[in-house]
Amino acid sequence: MKSIYGFVHVREKLMRGLFLACALFSVVALATITVFLLASGLPFIAEIGLGEFFGTRWAPLSDTPAYGILSMLVASLYVTALSVLIGVGIGLFTAICLYKFCPRWLVSPIRQMVNLLSGIPSVIFGLFGMTVIVPFIRDYISPSGVGYGILSSALVLGIMILPTIVSVSLDAMQAVPGSYFEGALALGSTREQATFRVMLPAAKSGILAGVVLAVGRAIGETMAVIMVVGNSPEMPVSLFQSVRTLTANIALGATEMKGDPERALIATGVVLFVFTLLLNTSFSLLKRDKTEKDDRKSRRKKESAKEAQS
C-alpha cells in the first residue's frame, strides 16, 4: 500500500514539475524575445534619433543611408484598419446569420467552410490576391491602372481574418443565456431587434476579443501582404498606391542586410512589438473596466433587492 502511495506521490510531483517547466518555458521565451528586441533595437533608435527613425525616407543601402519608417508605419495602419473593417463587417454578419437566421442544417457546413479558411497557408491567399484581386482592381476599379496597393492587401487580409471573427463572435453570442433572446421576444421585439439590441451588446466583450485577435493577425501578416502590396516604401496617399508595410520591410531585408540596416530592421520589430503590447494592454484594461462595472451593477441590484424585501 505504501509503495502504491509513494508511486502516486512521485507521479504527481513529476507532473507538477512538467507543468511548471512548460509555464516557465513560455515566460522565458517571451522574456528572451523582449530582451533581444530592446537590447538590439533601442540603442540604434537612440543613435540615429527619433526624428530620423520616424522620417519618410527609407534607403538603408544608399551612399547617404536613411532609416525612416514613417511611410511604412502609416501603410501598416491603413492596411490593418481597412482589412479589419472588411473582416469585421462580413464576419460579424456571418456570425449573426449562423446564430439565429440560418437554417440549422446549413450552420455546420458553413461554419466548417469558414474554419477551413484558417488552415489555408498565407502564400495561397497571396497567390489568390495576386492572380484574381490585383488584376480585378487594376482593370475595373483603380483610376491609375495599378492593382497592387492598400486596397488589394486589405481585401486579402480581410478574407484571412474572417475565421477568427466568425468563430469568436459566434461563440460569444452562443455563450449569452438564451433567456435574454426569449425575454426580448416576449416583450414584443422582432428577431432582428432582439439580436442587435440585446444579444450583441451582451456578447460585445467576446466580440471585441475576436477583433483584437484579428488586428494582431492583420498587422503581423507578411507573406500574403508582400505578394499584393507592391512594396514601394512611399507615404500612402491613395488606396491604389503601391506601398510597403513594416512586416514586409523586415522580411524583404532580413536575409540581405547587415550592420546598421539590419539593426534598423530589428528596431522596426521593436515598433511592431510595442504596438502589439499596447493593443493587448488596452483590451485587458477595457475588459477589466467592463467586469468591474458589471460587478458594481450586480451589487447594486442585490442591495436594492434586499432593501425591497426589508
Listing of model-derived features with the role each one plays in the protein:
Residues K2-K13, G17, A39-S83, P103-R104, ...:
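Periplasmic/extracellular loop-to-transmembrane helix junction in inner-membrane transport proteins
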